[in-house]
């Protein structure tokens, strides 16, 4: 997610992967996983800020209020002694929305390439997309000026490839919608304090997925 880069840079994936491996976890940035007849295509995704067809305004709002743009830093210049990575002291320059837009384009290109690739189980195989940011307005909840920093409109991609399901988080709202043949669900775990609110008890089971055959 976006918070994993706080205190570091957007190019820290290799360091985050090392941390994950050190505790026996998988780091699945732009990675494909397989379980039975299901493949999982995983990436952070970020957004294109164009959900409401005004990317320039959305980028301005996001840049002025979101902590991402004050807690994630531009990579130190090549050859500098800054060291890089999630343990180095912040540079004088924070990232801007244009930087995360660039990452979104990269992640989306990777995702489209994977969706175009034949499923190893053929037509019987299922594809589940797992991203941090949301892919559709129908699962965005109440819309305001910040919503385009949480969700993109990937209707065209969903229609073309019809993945079986799309799981995402970021907005911490338990929303679900069928878009064409794709079951889109917010499976956020949420912040620790959210477990203290009775209306958020659903977060305990929000990460569970039951397949169509009940298994």
Task: State the predicted function of each range.
Residues 25-28:
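A conserved beta-strand/loop element that lines the FAD pocket in flavoprotein oxidoreductases
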Residues 32-42, 47, 178-183:
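Beta-strand-turn-beta hairpins that frame and shape the catalytic cleft
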